[in-house]
């Protein structure tokens, strides 16, 4: 019963904070919020230039392999379980999927900067 109360209070408080975070900025809108800020100087060029897709791909690749490390770090503790074959199979499948994704990105020349 206490666990349900704690979880429900956390959900309610989180929902209230999210709603307030979305609602408050809309109350005080003025044109200076939409203008780019460049260290107090007038902007040299438009701040709304298109973003290079290469940076985005590198960031996504970093996040994927960061996730892989986060999922593989608990394996030494998971080896102490009774069903070690299932755990090792799951880890092997995870690494295989990520390796296939890396090979595909490499084949599509997503990791090359020169064009």
Curated annotation (Swiss-Prot):
Keyword terms, alphabetized: Electron transport, Membrane, Mitochondrion, Mitochondrion inner membrane, NAD, Respiratory chain, Translocase, Transmembrane, Transmembrane helix, Transport, Ubiquinone
Main location: mitochondrion
Membrane-spanning segments: 3-23, 55-75, 84-104
Intracellular or extracellular location(s): Mitochondrion inner membrane
Chemical reaction(s) catalysed: a ubiquinone + NADH + 5 H(+)(in) = a ubiquinol + NAD(+) + 4 H(+)(out)
Gene3D superfamilies given in the database record: NADH:ubiquinone/plastoquinone oxidoreductase, chain 3
Entry EC number(s): 7.1.1.2
Membrane topology of this protein: Multi-pass membrane protein
Molecular-function annotations in GO: NADH dehydrogenase (ubiquinone) activity
Enzyme class: translocase
InterPro entries: NADH_UbQ/plastoQ_OxRdtase_su3, NDAH_ubi_oxred_su3_sf
Any coiled-coil regions, as ranges: none
Pfam families, alphabetized: Oxidored_q4
One record GO biological process: mitochondrial electron transport, NADH to ubiquinone
GO cellular component: mitochondrial inner membrane; NADH dehydrogenase complex
Physiological role: Core subunit of the mitochondrial membrane respiratory chain NADH dehydrogenase (Complex I) which catalyzes electron transfer from NADH through the respiratory chain, using ubiquinone as an electron acceptor. Essential for the catalytic activity of complex I.
UniProt xrefs under PANTHER family: NADH-UBIQUINONE OXIDOREDUCTASE CHAIN 3 (PTHR11058:SF9)
Protein family per UniProt: Belongs to the complex I subunit 3 family.
Assembly and interaction partners: Core subunit of respiratory chain NADH dehydrogenase (Complex I) which is composed of 45 different subunits. Interacts with TMEM186. Interacts with TMEM242.
Protein name: NADH-ubiquinone oxidoreductase chain 3
Name of the gene this protein is made from: MT-ND3
């Amino acid at each position: 019963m206490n666990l349900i109360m704690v979880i429900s209070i956390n959900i309610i408080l989180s929902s209230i904070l999210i709603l307030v975070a979305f609602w408050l900025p809309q109350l005080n809108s003025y044109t200076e919020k939409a203008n780019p800020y460049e260290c107090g100087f007038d902007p040299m060029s438009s701040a709304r230039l298109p973003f290079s897709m290469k940076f985005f791909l590198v960031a996504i690749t970093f996040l994927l392999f960061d996730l892989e490390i986060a999922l593989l770090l608990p394996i030494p503790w998971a080896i102490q379980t009774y069903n070690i074959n299932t755990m090792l199979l799951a880890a092997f499948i995870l690494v295989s999927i990520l390796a296939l994704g890396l090979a595909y990105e490499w084949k599509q020349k997503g990791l090359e900067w020169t064009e």
